[in-house]
Amino acid sequence: MTPLFHLENIVRTYPDPASRDPHAVRTVLNLSELDIRAGEILGIRGHNGSGKSTLLRIIALLEPPDSGTVLFEGRPAGTDDLYLRRQVTLLLQTPYLLSRSVASNVAYGLRVRGIRNASELQNRIAASLLAVGLDPAVFLHRRRHELSGGECQRVALAARLALRPRVLLM
């Protein structure tokens, strides 16, 4: 069976800020092969700067590798493929929320994707908040500055779940 993701010979470098040579690079990811199957839960661990976040951004199709192959369901996947990018969503450790209400934060991605029907927006917002343990009656109109750090993380997760992605990276 074809894996959901197949990564092969992935290399990602960044400019080396410690070098005086303006062309010097630092390799942060050098991955020979990785298969991720549908439904699989996979943990990635490593030291700071070992490429964990870079790998997640490559899998989420937000950042291209310098070299190597990324396949999604057996077909080439790149950062320019909007359809594939919408199948995957990434929640970073320190999520960014808009300086707006919880409802606006959760609705933002839905609106970007063309969902404008008020009833559908309300249903998805409420369902995703409930899924992360936040009562919509209590949290819907709260603003970012009124939330604890953990509540901000839950709102960010609710925003991702509302999109109904096939793949959720955290």
What are these regions (language model features)?
Residues 60:
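Helix-to-loop junction immediately C-terminal to a conserved catalytic motif
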Residues 164:
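Conserved catalytic motifs of ABC-family nucleotide-binding domains
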Residues 68-78, 84, 134:
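Conserved ABC transporter NBD signature motif
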Residues 143-147, 151:
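Conserved ABC ATPase signature
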Residues 168-170:
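Catalytic Walker B motif of ABC-type/P-loop ATPase nucleotide-binding domains
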Residues 45-47:
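The feature captures the beta-strand-to-loop junction immediately N-terminal to the Walker
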Residues 157-158:
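Hydrophobic anchor residue at the start of the ABC signature
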